[in-house]
Design a protein with these regions (language model features):
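Basic-flanked hydrophobic alpha-helices used for secretion and membrane insertion
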Residues: 1-191
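Hydrophobic alpha-helical transmembrane segments of multi-pass inner-membrane transport and secretion
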Residues: 189-214
């Protein structure tokens, strides 16, 4: 199904939230035995990296269509060493047909960047792409995709009970959302540190199903 790629209007205009940044989640990755790994290939830009406070330990975001960047958790879980320039093989099924052996495909990329781990640290982190390529490279995968929008709270919104804030936002949005309680409800942080990481206080996935065609 092809639907709007725009973020949810009620969230984009919400009094508590800053404008969103987007990650495209596209390809379910398989291991060498064609078992699902639970990790996703997608694409995001510098704006997402900045708002998500993602840290590149080595290298850079993909600039060319044969490049890929991954976080350490995804990289090591798939059995790679983690060296810049390493060849990464992405195994996937066209149109997400996981039970159709004839749909199995492989594409190779060169590792250009390694992020500090986030897929196993963020709650629901594995719903975000643990491996990213350029949008153009992503467009050749014949798979269903969705847009994930990451929102941050405005600096004026300060409270010790972010769960209540989230519930109010969820009521207003009426869309699929996720609450990262592993971060939001962690009380021992000083207030200054909480505000420094305000980017992750409200992480909302606004789903827009789209299909990339070859």
């Amino acid at each position: 199904e092809i639907t709007s790629e725009e973020p949810n209007q009620s969230l984009s205009e919400h009094a508590y939230l800053n404008p969103p940044v987007k990650a495209v989640t596209c390809v379910d990755m398989f291991n060498q035995d064609w078992k699902m790994t639970g990790y996703i290939l997608g694409s995001f830009d510098e704006a997402f990296v900045k708002q998500g406070r993602l840290k590149l330990d080595e290298g850079h975001l993909p600039e060319n269509d044969d490049e890929i960047a991954m976080d350490w958790n995804t990289l090591l879980s798939l059995g790679y060493v983690g060296e810049i320039g390493e060849t990464i093989t992405i195994r996937y099924c066209e149109e997400n047909s996981v039970y159709n052996a004839s749909a199995r495909q492989e594409r190779q990329f060169r590792l250009c960047g390694i992020f500090a781990n986030y897929t196993s640290i963020w709650k629901y982190g594995r719903k975000m792409p643990g491996a990213v390529v350029t949008e153009n490279a992503l467009s050749v995968f014949n798979t269903k995709s969705r847009n994930s929008y990451l929102y941050s709270l405005k600096e004026s919104v300060r409270t010790s009970d972010y769960n209540t804030v989230y519930k109010k936002i969820k009521e207003d949005a009426k869309t699929e959302t996720e609450y990262n309680s592993a971060v939001y409800d962690y009380q021992p942080w000083s207030s200054a540190l909480v505000y420094a990481y305000m980017y992750i206080v409200v992480m909302i996935l606004a789903i827009a199903a789209i299909i990339y065609q070859l």
